[in-house]
Amino acid sequence: MASVAAKREGPQFISEVSVRGNGAVLDYCRTSVSALSGATAGILGLTGLYGFVFYFLASFLLSLLLILKAGRRWNKCFKSRRLLFTGGLVGGLFTYVLFWTFLYGMVHVY
């Protein structure tokens, strides 16, 4: 009975389809938060370094929320924890700047 109750030792198998699906969800979350935070920064009138600091704070907050959501068993969903922090960071920056400049121009220039 002890052998049945013991945990199975060996390599952990990961579904590539699930990993890609989780990556797509992360990209969607990162893009959505980038657009929302860019719009917020534009409406608030942030300029220069304050705007970029706002993006990195919003991105860091999203990463913390994703880590909390994944919990202790993050390795069942992702290959590495670094993906939760850096995945889509640069692509999100381009989305952020697009919404930031658009909303800043609409609210404060026109």
Swiss-Prot record:
Disulfide bond sites: none
Major subcellular site: endoplasmic reticulum
Keywords from the named record: Endoplasmic reticulum, Membrane, Transmembrane, Transmembrane helix
Pfam families assigned to the protein according to its UniProt record, in alphabetical order: EMC6 (PF07019)
GO CC term, one of those recorded: membrane
Function as written in the Swiss-Prot or TrEMBL entry: Part of the endoplasmic reticulum membrane protein complex (EMC) that enables the energy-independent insertion into endoplasmic reticulum membranes of newly synthesized membrane proteins. Preferentially accommodates proteins with transmembrane domains that are weakly hydrophobic or contain destabilizing features such as charged and aromatic residues. Involved in the cotranslational insertion of multi-pass membrane proteins in which stop-transfer membrane-anchor sequences become ER membrane spanning helices.
Cited PANTHER family: ER MEMBRANE PROTEIN COMPLEX SUBUNIT 6
UniProt protein name: ER membrane protein complex subunit 6
Organism annotation: Danio rerio
Lineage start: Eukaryota, Metazoa, Chordata, Craniata, Vertebrata
Underlying gene: emc6
